Amino acid sequence: MRFLKTEAIVLKSNLISEKDKIATLFTRDYGKLQAVAKGARRSKSRFVNAVRPFIVANYVIFEGQNYYYIDQWELVKNFENIEKDLKKFALASYISETISRVLEEKQKNTKLYFFTKHSLEAVESLNVETSIFLFSYTLKLISLLGYMPVLDSCAVCGKKENLSYFSSSCGGAVCKDCNETCKDAKFLNKKVLKFLLYLLKAKYEKLERISVPGVIKEEADKIITEYVRTHLEMDFKSKDFAMKLSD
């Protein structure tokens, strides 16, 4: 029997029987795995807390006929504020859904693992406006997946002047001379462009200090949503819930 030892983040867990739970684990060393915690629904079971959503733990797991099974576990990090705060919980749920969907089973991605862990730690410890954190996380995630939007020059010709449009299909900001090249190019407010660039580049800690007018956030939301749809061909249900809780 082959045993795997790895640190992992619990992205989500569900009931699989009257006594057991199955968890989606994002493991540091083996990617996304489905693992069963036998007896996790029993209050006295050693696995009762082993697959609580968003925890980070060290696991020993083994492969069965249909699933992996948890043999041992040891807690590394528990996010108490996420459990207590609905806004933080909504952001953590968004992180969980996005990572669950962009990752294929058993696809190791160490950079994405540590990005996910860091993002959850930021949600836990910082007090950033919900929509602003969500936008920044999404831009950082899609960039890590290889679709970083060009925001400081024209995505078509490379010029840094007159960036008056945005095109998801062309990959970012577009100058006025190239906008007809991109069929989906839409006018881009300079303040929105500056906001998007800041969200992409700034560390999460810096986001606590900014306040942005609602009209700018609304336009940024439209651009990011369309960009994600174009490049990932996905919408995320948990986003709507998080946005409803935004300040």
From Swiss-Prot:
Organism listed in the record: Caldanaerobacter subterraneus subsp. tengcongensis (strain DSM 15242 / JCM 11007 / NBRC 100824 / MB4) (Thermoanaerobacter tengcongensis)
Alphabetized InterPro entries for the sequence: ARFGAP/RecO (IPR037278), DNA_rep/recomb_RecO_N (IPR022572), NA-bd_OB-fold (IPR012340), RecO (IPR003717), RecO_C (IPR042242)
Entry protein name: DNA repair protein RecO
Top-level taxon of the source organism: Bacteria
Record SUPFAM superfamilies: ArfGap/RecO-like zinc finger, Nucleic acid-binding proteins
Keyword RNA-binding among record annotations: no
HAMAP family: RecO
Keyword Magnesium: no
